[in-house]
């Protein structure tokens, strides 16, 4: 299985190139790039007001207001400090870098810029991990509509944090492959006693979402993670956040890869069958041709 990158490589490559050119004393060049990421996220890298010595990185998340309710602004301020500026029009968060005043810790700054989406997501997890750490129970469940028709729920108890993702399968084939994929997760947990508990329910939401407006349907699935203190501790939480916030994308990515692999195997097998059939086909019977006088035609 392939782990998706948590960071955004495009941002890191652009910023690395800009910093290297600035450090070498090269004349700055114009940058104007707009690109998308998972979950409907949109990035924009540009020179604000046409100033080539400045690089602005902006991100648009349709669900950012919901993240703000859980302290996203404070988390980003702690991570980015003075690089965080008023957001560009049409975007939720903007970072500004001055190529004439390069930071001493360039590698770290570049890496954190590439983690912008992840750090936006981190606020809701950090909040509920802290609730669990402090033994708080009964706090209102977090509900994040991270996609148009898909939702994430986070709830804290004294001994665990429960994270539930709802997801929509577009095809019947996706449901089948998704079930097999999730069964492998359950089997894999038996080999690792430190792994979180993973549950999958099809059509109906899990008991944790009882009496909510959680969607129900043949193409709806729910993935539940039960995170214990060993997963939410100060030493482990960063890695937990890295892995869990990309899980929905990870699942659907592997469903698509599985379908592509199956189709490739089917095409290869069909090609093999055609070769066998062609070899087994009998040669056409040669019909003897004669003239009216009884002479036989001979092929030249």
UniProtKB/Swiss-Prot annotation:
Originating gene: arpc2-b
Name used for this protein in its record: Actin-related protein 2/3 complex subunit 2-B
Give the quaternary structure.
Answer: Component of the Arp2/3 complex composed of actr2/arp2, actr3/arp3, arpc1 (arpc1a or arpc1b), arpc2, arpc3, arpc4 and arpc5.
Q: What subcellular locations does the record give?
A: Cytoplasm, Cytoskeleton; Cell projection; Nucleus
Keywords of this entry: Actin-binding, Cell projection, Cytoplasm, Cytoskeleton, Nucleus
Q: Where are the transmembrane segments?
A: none
Q: What is its main location?
A: cytoplasm
- The organism of origin for this protein: Xenopus laevis
A single Gene Ontology biological process assigned to it is: actin filament polymerization
The record describes the protein's role as: Actin-binding component of the Arp2/3 complex, a multiprotein complex that mediates actin polymerization upon stimulation by nucleation-promoting factor (NPF). The Arp2/3 complex mediates the formation of branched actin networks in the cytoplasm, providing the force for cell motility. In addition to its role in the cytoplasmic cytoskeleton, the Arp2/3 complex also promotes actin polymerization in the nucleus, thereby regulating gene transcription and repair of damaged DNA.
**Pfam families the UniProt entry points to:** P34-Arc
UniProt family annotation: Belongs to the ARPC2 family.
